């Protein structure tokens, strides 16, 4: 969503965001122009946004997401503090271009979770969820690019489908503030099963249809739910020893790259963040 995470994102950007309903249906598009500049005296980044929802959203709550917005962003190590007035919250950068964030938009009465992933060149994937209390309002998936002409980035029209790929996993240990990277392979066994293996790990995933959603099994020891929103799969799996993993799997705009972002929780405490980049 709207949580830029690194100094490389300074400048002028255009973002095309697809808006999905809680049921997974595509509702419309928001076009966003974003400018980030550094306040020399403080080092704080000033973020200006202009958002234009399309006509398909005129009867949806996201129609209010129109006009000009501002907030300040303060960098502190790998943390990004969103200081208002329009966005308050926190983002964590890791794995060379991944950002995981959360916060509130008080003007709308929404809280949010967000993520972004830097792509090769001057581009990024971005997304997240808006909530009112605990009720989801919209799921956003976007593509951003530096402003170079009058064209807008093309939103992905892909539908999530598993593919085998090679890649790299980077895990950030939050207690130590240390990252560890290793090669990883994703092997698709069939339309609902895949395995990921690399240095010291092997994780087997199975999706079982459950209405319009899925029950997800991980290593036959954790079970959870998963749902598709266009090119993205959201999932959460719970083990029997206080372990919880929350993840997204998302296709890159060119279909040749896949990305995963995982949050690993133990006994209610967020212990690590994991970013995975796969090349098909």
Kindly give the residue locations of the regions a language model identified.
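Soluble ligand-binding/transfer domains with enclosed cavities or grooves
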Residues: 3, 7-9, 14-280
